[in-house]
Every structure is written in C-alpha cells, then in structure tokens.
Amino acid sequence: MSKFNRIHLVVLDSVGIGAAPDANNFVNAGVPDGASDTLGHISKTVGLNVPNMAKIGLGNIPRETPLKTVAAESNPTGYATKLEEVSLGKDTMTGHWEIMGLNITEPFDTFWNGFPEEILTKIEEFSGRKVIRETNKPYSGTAVIYDFGPRQMETGELIIYTSADPVLQIAAHEDIIPLDELYRICEYARSITLERPALLGRIIARPYVGEPGNFTRTANRRDLAVSPFSPTVLDKLNEAGIDTYAVGKINDIFNGAGINHDMGHNKSNSHGIDTLLKTMGLAEFEKGFSFTNLVDFDALYGHRRNAHGYRDCLHEFDERLPEIIAAMRENDLLLITADHGNDPTYAGTDHTREYIPLLAYSPAFKGNGLIPVGHFADISATVADNFGVETAMIGESFLDKLV
C-alpha cells in the first residue's frame, strides 16, 4: 500500500541553491562556477520574499551562509534539504534524467565553436533555406534575434545557434517561416544529430514575433529530445499501471518515455500552475505521479542575467503556492525542487553547476525537519519506493524520513 496516493513533483527550472562541490569543473564565459549561488545571490543583491516556501523550510536548508532574506523556521510545515548532481552535465535534460534515476557518465556533445559545416549544409539542402553562418556559435537567444531577426525577415534565412548546453536551436519569425515548417526542419535536424560526433540532447524550435528592435519569443517553443538511454522511474511507474502526468516541457525532455498523460506545454509559469491545478483536480487522478516544469526562471531571467526579474518570478510562484497546497488531497505529497542553477548575477549567460533545493510537504505530515543532503536521483528513488516499483540506476529513498 502506498504511503502517499499521489506525488506531485514541481521543478523550478534553474533555481539552484549554491555551488556544487565539483562546480569549478564547469565554466561560464571562462569563469569557473565555484562561486555561483542562484538563490543566495538573488537574496543578497535584490532581496527575496518567499514566505510560503520559507514556511516549508527553504531557509532551513544547510548552507555556509544562510539566505540573507529568507529566515529559518523554528517549526516548518514540511521537510527540506539540498541535493547534489552526479552526472557529467548541467543542462536541463541531464538534470531531469538524473532526477528520474539515471547517471549520465558520458556527456552530450557541445559546440563552443559552432556546428560542423556538414550539419549546416544538410539542413540547407533539406529546408531549401540558407543558414546565417554568423549565428553558428553559442549565442543568447534574445540577442541573436535582435542582431539577425531583421536579416531573417528580409531573406528568409535560418538562424541556427547553440549554447554551453548540448543543443541546436533554430529561431524563426512566425510570419516568415511558418510554425509547421520550423517544426519540420527541427525534426530533420533531430534525425541527423543522434550519434557522435554530433550527439545532441535537444533540438529546440525558437519561434518569435514582432518588428526589428521589438522581437518577442512566443510560447510555441518545441523541444525535440532523445529518449533516455535506460528506463527511468517514469517507465517503471508506467509499466506498473500507475498514471504519470506531464506538465510543461516534461514530455519533451523525456521524449514521451514513461508518460501516459501529457497535459501540454506551458505558455508561462502561471499557465503551468493553472495546468497543474487542473491536473490535480481530475477525478480520475486518484493515484499516481505528476511531474511539472516551470521554465520562466531559466528562460526569461537566468540566461538574461536579470536578477530583479528572477526574484519577481520567484515571488509570483510563492504567491501561488497556497493554491497548489489547497488542491492537495490528504494523502498527497508535494516535492518542489530544481534541475540545475542559473545564477542571474554570474558571469556568462549559461547554467551554473549547483546544488538544488528540495522541499517536501503533505497535509498528512505529523513531523518536520531536515532530510540528509543527498543526490538528485533520491527524488525518483523515493517516488519508486512509495509506489512499490523498482528504482532506476541510482538514488536512495528518503520516504521513511517523511512522517
């Protein structure tokens, strides 16, 4: 018999809580990640007011320096800790896959100097469109459309760029390159990047609208991932007949593997929370697992190094957290975590190698406190333990700590 009938896992994309022990092995614009601290630096530089997460225990998570504006609770309503990543990567897919029990020992390919000419030529031949060679490098997604969007509007050329992550991104103005065509080109790019020397984690369609100087990326983003190389706990749940619900880009990240209810993409964090609430309210969702990703922290503010916007985004989530708690049933468990860091005060524009926070809350809790510091995959091990299925590759359950 399951301890909790339903578990809801919410990933606050990129909300790290301090540099991981191996952070100096990872860099941003040539600067090691060893001094990165997403929540710590936001709290210190622009202030952070998240009383609802604080009540569960966010300020109680052990740190060398306590969060400046998030106090520890003497009697929190839940459990808290921080988790370390063991996989060799700091990208979204690696983080989520490890959360679901995989250890990625061979990282995907990254292209600091741009993609090989062979890749670009194949895409040109397939699409019938030229590729702007000047964008073929790690580039900020907002900067690349600012710099080359006007040219694309004139010529119809493709904007292809990458980042420190193993991704190939194609930006296209929706009035110039229709969504169906963009998605078709991305599907082709996915088909030619499934093995080395160009094994990529994701192909990302990045549509945008607007006029030169005032371009805006739309919610029609599409991620084309590869399937996990080994069964995750999602697969184990699915095989056991336990419902799995995906909210936001979760279905894309796992390429649909182990997910039997895709609730769709999010237009924003607020829309994602609305979808989660709708999912939690489904009469047929009596037992199972929901998995939500809220990406605005990362996509809108982390990469753009906008600490004020990031803080406000955290405030907005915290203000809606009581709605999520109110939608819980007596034997539900809520887990709030992240997948990597993206310190908006740090060098560069890419992710930072950090611990992730973990907050656990249930109306059924009679106790509270700290869970021992562990690893990302402990989350999936706990989910597996609760529902009586096998774990994946790694992870240790903390289910017995939740009382």
UniProtKB/Swiss-Prot annotation:
Reactions accelerated catalytically:
2-deoxy-alpha-D-ribose 1-phosphate = 2-deoxy-D-ribose 5-phosphate; alpha-D-ribose 1-phosphate = D-ribose 5-phosphate
Q: Which UniProt keywords apply?
A: Cytoplasm, Isomerase, Manganese, Metal-binding, Phosphoprotein
Instruction: Name its cellular compartments.
Output: Cytoplasm
A GO biological process held by the record: 2-deoxyribose 1-phosphate catabolic process
Binding-site positions, Mn(2+) 2? D298, H303, H351
Residues noted as binding Mn(2+) 1 in the record, renumbered to the chain: D13, D339, H340
Q: How is it modified after translation?
A: Phosphorylated.
Which pathway does it take part in?
Answer: Carbohydrate degradation; 2-deoxy-D-ribose 1-phosphate degradation; D-glyceraldehyde 3-phosphate and acetaldehyde from 2-deoxy-alpha-D-ribose 1-phosphate: step 1/2
InterPro entries recorded:
Alkaline_phosphatase_core_sf, DeoB, Metalloenzyme, Phosphopentomutase_DeoB_cap_sf
Give the enzyme's main class according to its UniProt record, as a single word.
isomerase
Please list the cofactors this protein needs: Mn(2+)
Molecular function terms from GO: magnesium ion binding; manganese ion binding; phosphopentomutase activity
- Cofactor notes: Binds 2 manganese ions.
Q: Name one GO cellular component term.
A: cytosol
EC number(s) in its UniProt entry? 5.4.2.7
Task: Explain the purpose of this protein.
Answer: Isomerase that catalyzes the conversion of deoxy-ribose 1-phosphate (dRib-1-P) and ribose 1-phosphate (Rib-1-P) to deoxy-ribose 5-phosphate (dRib-5-P) and ribose 5-phosphate (Rib-5-P), respectively.
Q: Which family does it belong to?
A: Belongs to the phosphopentomutase family.
Q: Which NCBIfam families match?
A: deoB, PRK05362.1
Q: Which PANTHER family match?
A: PHOSPHOPENTOMUTASE (PTHR21110:SF0)
Q: What is this protein called?
A: Phosphopentomutase
UniProt lists the gene as deoB
